Swiss-Prot record:
It catalyses: thymidine + phosphate = 2-deoxy-alpha-D-ribose 1-phosphate + thymine. InterPro entries: Glycosyl_Trfase_fam3 (IPR000312), Glycosyl_Trfase_fam3_N_dom (IPR017459), Glycosyl_Trfase_fam3_N_dom_sf (IPR036320), Nuc_phospho_transferase (IPR035902), PYNP-like_C_sf (IPR036566), PYNP_C (IPR013102), Pyrmidine_PPas_bac/euk (IPR018090), Pyrmidine_PPase_CS (IPR017872). Keywords: Glycosyltransferase, Transferase. GO terms for cellular component: cytosol. The enzymes which catalyze the reversible phosphorolysis of pyrimidine nucleosides are involved in the degradation of these compounds and in their utilization as carbon and energy sources, or in the rescue of pyrimidine bases for nucleotide synthesis. It comes from Mycobacterium tuberculosis (strain CDC 1551 / Oshkosh). GO terms for biological process: pyrimidine nucleobase metabolic process; pyrimidine nucleoside metabolic process. This is Thymidine phosphorylase. Belongs to the thymidine/pyrimidine-nucleoside phosphorylase family. The keyword Transferase applies. The gene is deoA. Its EC number is 2.4.2.4.
Amino acid sequence: MTDFAFDAPTVIRTKRDGGRLSDAAIDWVVKAYTDGRVADEQMSALLMAIVWRGMDRGEIARWTAAMLASGARLDFTDLPLATVDKHSTGGVGDKITLPLVPVVAACGGAVPQASGRGLGHTGGTLDKLESITGFTANLSNQRVREQLCDVGAAIFAAGQLAPADAKLYALRDITGTVESLPLIASSIMSKKLAEGAGALVLDVKVGSGAFMRSPVQARELAHTMVELGAAHGVPTRALLTEMNCPLGRTVGNALEVAEALEVLAGGGPPDVVELTLRLAGEMLELAGIHGRDPAQTLRDGTAMDRFRRLVAAQGGDLSKPLPIGSHSETVTAGASGTMGDIDAMAVGLAAWRLGAGRSRPGARVQHGAGVRIHRRPGEPVVVGEPLFTLYTNAPERFGAARAELAGGWSIRDSPPQVRPLIVDRIV
């Protein structure tokens, strides 16, 4: 069907009024937007209509396929490697990719990880890694192949992989259209299918700091993505994981890199270590790699060695100090007791206000901005002790950050309920 059969206002009205978009309409609007024939304002209206009206499974599958078809698709089937990848739907303090990728590589897997930048209140893996002096995520397809063979892993910008999603991803970030199951599922799977991994494990976050707040929503998202992977011949499974509280003790780009290095050195927060090892086990099993102990790679330093090699291969210099905000403020305890729940959304928004995230596409982030959490839920608190430290290069940001954080934590007489880190497993 020719382009003359469609126009943006008609497609927008169809979805606005609760109609179903045809395969041809989806193919046209995704391609036309990628080519610049549909304006940002028009696509913003369509995205908002999708947020409100939703999409059925057929529409989601076609939207995913249209974004996948918008660019190149990597193919590693000729390499003597078991390729496998992981993707998180986005959380607060979610630095898991940084220790996970080298752990899996040290166990014999090859991980081609096409990663993104911060979206909304959640941090982006590329923003974190680019806080390392010299690190570049812009790799050619050939360089990705070479690095998989040499290092066993590459973490790179999607580039020409699903360029339609790259434009939509940036637009959703500034138009209040992030929290949509069809848009999240299609965004993730178009990139992941394009990167050519032979298997995929999904970390679907659920809770206040996730895009899916309820387990029902998260399970629906997980099932949708597992089905999309299977339909394209990529074995896919998902873990539903807790995101009511931030992961670890840091939220922000360089702060999270430093914490990931602690994990790779054999330490680090228990929840970050637990999730890293659980996801590594799932990835190795799905890739058909057996008899390897992911935890051993943290104990013997082989995972750290892989991370150093990966960073060096991509121009990074870990001998240079990581940046930290030139100004800091500390939130202290006004009473003694036990740290209650910490709301992940509140902390994520505070870090965003401090400069760790962006408010428009292409804006620069402050690599040294963020929040350090001194007391986790259930830990004892003494009056006057530091609970959070806020970092930024722009001290005028502290007021807005404190306002976001206020009400997002409490001090109690008794410990809060302990929630399991792994909520469910979808295969």
